[in-house]
Amino acid sequence: IYFLAGRYEFRDKGIDIYIKALGKLNEKLKQEKSRKTIIAFIWVPANFRNIKTQILENKTLFQDIKEALEEVMGDVEKNMIYSFVSNKKIAKEILFEDNFLTEMKIRVARFVRKGNPPVATHDLYDENDTILREIYESNLKNGEDDPVKIIYYPIYLSGADGLLNLNYYEAMQGSHLGIFPSYYEPWGYTPLEAGALGVASVTTDLAGFGRYFCTECSQSETPGIYVLKRLNKSHDDVVQQLVEVMFTYS
C-alpha cells in the first residue's frame, strides 16, 4: 500500500510526479509479468459532492455477506471439527447447508459488478478535476490486469468518514510506503511522521526536510527514507527516479 497525503497543491506537493510515476510503474510491472498488486492512495481533500452510490451499495452488500457468514460460524466450526476427527475431506458442502450456499450465491451475484472499480471514492463538483484528469491521462484505470490500483480519496481522514473510518495516523500505519515528491516544501513533516510510525517514505532534495536529511549523502539500496534528486532535474528524470524506488520497494 502506497500513499500520498497533503493539501491540494498539485505541483508543489508532487502529486503530478506521483500519478505519472504510478502509470509508468503499472506498465513496468505488466512487462515484468509481476504478480504483485500495488494499492496507491491519494489522500488529498477536494471539493466533493458525496460518496459514490456504487461504493455505498457495495459496502452494504459486503456487510450483508459478512453478517450472514458470522451467523453460521458456530455450525461451520462444528462441521470442521467433525471433518477433522472423521478424517474426511473438507468441502463447502460439508461446512454449509445447501440453502445457505444458495442464498450466498444470490448475495454474491448482487455484489459483483461489471467493469472497472472507480478511481475516486467520491463524486466531485469539478468534472475536470486536475488529479482525476492526470489519473486518466496516465492510463490508470483499475483494470483487472492492472497491477497498480489507484484510489483517489478526496476527504479528510477524520476516523468517521463513512468509508475507511481511520484517522490520518491510523491510515499511515496501515501502509507500507509514503510518497511525498515535493517540488517546494519549506520543511515538510510528513516523511518524518511516517518514519516515527515505522513506515518508509520518499521525499526530495527540494523539501526542507529532504535537504536536511540527505543532500550529498550516498543512500543504501533500501533506506528508511528515500530522497529523490529534484534540484536541476527534469520532470521526466524525477518521474523515472520515483518509478525505480516504487518498483524496488514492491
Protein language model regions, located:
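Acidic donor-binding loop of glycosyltransferase active sites
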Residues: 169-186
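Conserved catalytic-core segment of nucleotide-activated headgroup transferases in glycan assembly
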Residues: 1-169
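Short, well-ordered loop/turn and helix-capping segments at boundaries between secondary-structure elements
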Residues: 11, 24-31, 46-49, 177, ...
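Beta-sheet entry/capping signal
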Residues: 1-2, 16, 37-41, 149-150, ...
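Glycine-rich loops and low-complexity Gly/Arg-rich segments
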Residues: 26-30, 64-69, 175-178, 203-206, ...
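Catalytic binding pocket for nucleotide-activated donors in carbohydrate/polymer assembly enzymes
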Residues: 181-250
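A broad, structural surface signal
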Residues: 16-27, 170-173, 192, 240, ...
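A structural signal for short secondary-structure junctions
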Residues: 34-35, 144, 172-173, 195, ...
